[in-house]
Design a protein with these regions (language model features):
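Feature representing long, continuous alpha-helical segments
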Residues: 388, 412, 425, 432, ...
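C-terminal non-catalytic interaction modules
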Residues: 521, 525-527, 531-595
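Catalytic cores of extracellular degradative/oxidative enzymes
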Residues: 262-263, 270, 274, 280-285, ...
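Residue register of alpha-helical TPR repeats
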Residues: 68, 102, 150, 240, ...
Length: 595
């Protein structure tokens, strides 16, 4: 029998549940989703087909060339984490061949959870389950295709006997990972299945693959790494394998092993902004912040080209400010990452470009993400703007409750601007307001743990700089020593929730006090050079501010007084610094009062 193509969305197509989804990379790890993708994308027009997504293909059982082409487009978008585009490509493929087993499998895959969205909207779960059940009723299915459908089906079981929804989802994830583990052993030479197996394992505990020293956190991580690396030996240009390889390796002690593959990824799918961005996860971890910025700048421009294409397409595009996860999540993640990378180079032009792009990327109304990103914008200003320019920046408009994090960040930037102008009264007034806004933030949003930690850092840095301005840098040192420990306790996020090491500011105050050896030690700690077992989450490798601080400390100590080892360290810091701030060319913001 042939399964009816019918209405993919079913009777619940326009229902929406819960709060707005938060993309983990731009929000809190483990955040919950909101709107069912099948509802958001219900009225999306037929997809264009000229997205420059490369040549990844998986031959499926169909006699229709358009179905095959659209299936491949869905697979490429799935590998690029644009699940909405993946979903509409698979729907279009199924429309052309109602007997296509893999088209139904693809629809179900695109409606599932992923490492950046941990829950499963009930509407999406039901539609995915029905798609897979219908696929199993299709006669003469290819054995491997049927096996993929059977492996995916546990991901969408209802499990009504389990009272808690999060526990139901954990059970689904575990059962799916078990099924994909078995399938990966059955088809060891299929790169798509190896990718899906690694993805299933990673979804068991998203972003918790390695401990804070870079060792595997769970027993199932090494086999997943082996599967991806084995697949890459024969399929080095498989965009899915490379994408998941970056994610599964970035938190390890050896992110550099991914670099040769990461370097090639943007050219494999130049029209997929998220894949153009992905190498920066490795470049950032290995301390190559110029390349990290460049990757994210290119990714941002790639996404903007994509938006123009879909917005100009049939039906007027797919921009839905109420829940388009890609546009309001992944796109702005590129810009955030570009800004975080640019800050660590001290490049004024790059920081200005990214900060301006981030500010102009708003447009969905005030949400958690909007508040967070406006806060990031304000936090960046002291690194490249003059005090006068910062003081001219208006605070967020609208209700204070909507902008708690952004308002704290604005207060913080105001304090530092007044300090640099040596305006003690202005700094004190801004700090009093900062304190008030931090208290309100804690009282109203108790669950935003990392936001509270970042707010505490802003208080500490502002307090220390005021102490320094008032001639009591030693008091500021004590404040920052405590704050550095608090930053060490923050969870992994990429880029880090607080974009620079507190230790660089601590070093600036130590240099001011003439404690050059202490400053050098602190700066090496910020770079992760002091201890090979240092917590990977607390290291900012390749940070230009640290190299600048090292050169300042050594020069004030007296070049003629350096030991051979110190001279070697000084020369190395100058060499790295020259990469970010060459004698002629880029405008460089690196200075002790900005650190």
């Amino acid at each position: 029998m042939s399964a009816s193509s019918g209405d993919v969305h079913g009777a619940m197509v326009h229902s929406m549940q819960g709060m707005e989804s938060e993309h983990m990379m731009s929000a809190l790890p483990g955040s919950k989703s909101s709107f069912a993708l099948s509802a958001i994308a219900a009225d999306d027009p037929e997809p264009p087909t000229d997205f420059q997504l490369g040549s990844l293909t998986k031959e499926i059982k169909t006699a229709n060339p358009e179905t095959q082409a659209l299936f491949d487009q869905g697979l490429r978008f799935y590998c690029a984490f644009n699940f909405r585009e993946s979903y509409r490509a698979y729907k279009a493929a199924l429309k052309r061949d109602p007997d296509c087993v893999m088209c139904r499998w693809g629809i179900a895959m695109s409606l599932g959870v992923n490492i950046n969205q941990l829950d499963q909207p009930e509407q999406d779960r039901r539609i995915a389950q029905q798609m897979l059940r219908d696929a199993l009723r299709i006669r003469d299915a290819d054995p491997k295709e049927r096996a993929l459908v059977e492996a995916l089906l546990p991901r969408y079981e209802a499990h009504r006997q389990i009272p808690d929804e999060s526990e139901r989802q954990n059970r689904r994830n575990k059962d799916y990972a078990g099924a994909m583990t078995a399938l990966a052993r059955r088809y060891p030479d299929d790169p798509d299945i190896q990718t899906l197996y690694a993805d299933a394992v990673m979804n068991l505990r998203p972003w918790e693959y390695w401990d804070r020293q870079g060792n595997p956190a769970y027993h199932d991580i090494p086999p997943a790494v082996d599967a991806v690396e084995g697949g890459l030996k024969a399929h080095a240009e498989h965009m899915g394998l490379v994408h998941w390889y970056i994610h599964i390796r970035e938190g390890s002690t050896e992110p550099n092993v991914v670099t040769p593959f990461a370097d090639k990824l943007p050219d494999l799918a130049p029209g997929a902004g998220h894949l153009v961005h992905m190498p920066s996860h490795i470049y950032y971890r290995t301390g190559d912040h110029l390349k990290s910025f460049e990757a994210n700048q290119k990714a941002t421009l790639s996404d903007e080209t994509y938006f123009k294409k879909v917005d100009a397409g049939p039906g007027g595009g797919i921009a839905h400010p109420d829940g388009d996860r890609y546009r309001w999540g992944y796109y702005r993640h590129n810009i955030h990452f570009a800004l975080a990378s640019a800050i660590l180079t001290g490049n004024v032009e790059d920081m200005n470009w990214a900060a301006d792009r981030l500010r102009r990327s708003e447009g969905e109304g005030v949400t958690f993400r909007t508040d967070r990103y406006r806060g990031v914008y304000y936090q960046s200003l002291p690194y490249f703007m003059s005090p006068g320019e910062i003081l001219q920046q208006p605070p967020p408009d609208g209700t204070a409750k909507d902008w708690r994090y952004a308002r704290i960040s604005w207060d913080y930037a105001q304090v530092l601007a007044h300090v640099r102008k040596r305006d003690a009264g202005g700094a004190r007034r801004a700090y009093v307001q900062l304190d008030k806004d931090v208290i309100a933030f804690r009282n109203e949003r108790r669950d935003e743990v990392m936001g509270h930690q970042a707010a505490q850092i802003m208080q500490s840095v502002a307090h220390a700089r005021i102490d320094q301005m008032n001639g009591d840098a030693q008091s500021g040192v004590r404040v920052l020593e405590r704050s550095a420990g608090q930053q060490d306790a923050m969870n992994y996020d990429e880029p880090p929730y607080w974009m620079v090491p507190v230790r660089q500011t601590l070093a600036a105050l130590l240099i001011d006090l003439g404690r050059y050896d202490n400053a050098i030690k602190v700066l090496h700690a910020s770079l992760g050079n002091d201890d090979p077992n240092r917590d990977l989450y607390t290291s900012f490798k390749g940070n230009g501010w640290a190299y600048f601080g090292l050169t300042q400390a050594y020069e004030r100590k007296g070049i003629e007084n350096l030991t051979p080892g110190q001279r070697e360290d000084y020369d190395g810091a100058r060499k790295r610094l020259a990469e970010y701030c060459p004698p002629a060319g880029r405008a460089c913001a690196l200075s002790l009062d900005r650190m």
